[in-house]
Swiss-Prot record:
Pfam families (UniProt xref): PapD_C
Family note: Belongs to the periplasmic pilus chaperone family.
Keyword field contains Chaperone: yes
Lineage of origin: Bacteria, Pseudomonadati, Pseudomonadota, Gammaproteobacteria, Enterobacterales
Protein name stated in the entry: Chaperone protein PrsD
Top-rank lineage group of the source organism: Bacteria
Keyword entries, A-Z: Chaperone, Fimbrium biogenesis, Immunoglobulin domain, Periplasm
GO CC field: periplasmic space
Subcellular location: Periplasm
Species in which this protein is naturally found: Escherichia coli
SUPFAM superfamilies per the UniProt record, alphabetical: Periplasmic chaperone C-domain
InterPro entries reported in the protein's UniProt record: Ig-like_fold, Periplasmic_pilus_chap, Pili_assmbl_chap_C_dom_sf, Pili_assmbl_chaperone_C
Function: Mediates assembly of pili by forming soluble multimeric complexes with pili subunits as an intermediate step in the assembly process.
C-alpha cells in the first residue's frame, strides 16, 4: 500500500509598513473592468490576492470551475468570464473563502459595500 500526498503552503511576509488591522477587509478595493470576452481584475492594494472563483452568483463564485489567479500587489490580470452581476471569491488571511458582490457602472465594476 502506497499513499502520496501533495500539499502547497503559501507563506507571505508583510513588512511593518503595510501590516493590516485585525478584521480589516482590504480586498474590497479590487476592481473589475469589462474587456472583450471577460474582465480585467485590478488589484490597487500593496497585498497579494488569491482569487479562487468568479461567477454570476454567490454560489457559482464559491463552487464553479475557475482557474485560480494570484494577483501581485498593484497589478492586474484578465480572466475569460463575463457576467451581468459578477461575484468574486478569494482566500483571506485566515484561509476563509469570502465572496464579494460587485456593482457595475458602465465597464467598471466595484465591490458592493455591505451596510
Amino acid at each position: 500500500l502506497q499513499i502520496a500526498l501533495q500539499t502547497k503552503i503559501k507563506l507571505f511576509y508583510r513588512p511593518a509598513a503595510i501590516k493590516t488591522r485585525p478584521n480589516e477587509v482590504w480586498q474590497d478595493q479590487l476592481i473589475l473592468n469589462k474587456v472583450s470576452g471577460g474582465y480585467r481584475i485590478e488589484n490597487p492594494t500593496p497585498y497579494y490576492v488569491t482569487v479562487i472563483g468568479l461567477g454570476g452568483s454567490e454560489k457559482q463564485a464559491e463552487e464553479g470551475e475557475f482557474e485560480t489567479v494570484m494577483l501581485s500587489p498593484r497589478s492586474e490580470q484578465t480572466v475569460n468570464r463575463n457576467y451581468n452581476t459578477p461575484y468574486l471569491s478569494y482566500i483571506n488571511d485566515y484561509g476563509g473563502r469570502p465572496v464579494l458582490s460587485f456593482i457595475c457602472n458602465g465597464s467598471r465594476c466595484s465591490v458592493k459595500k455591505e451596510k
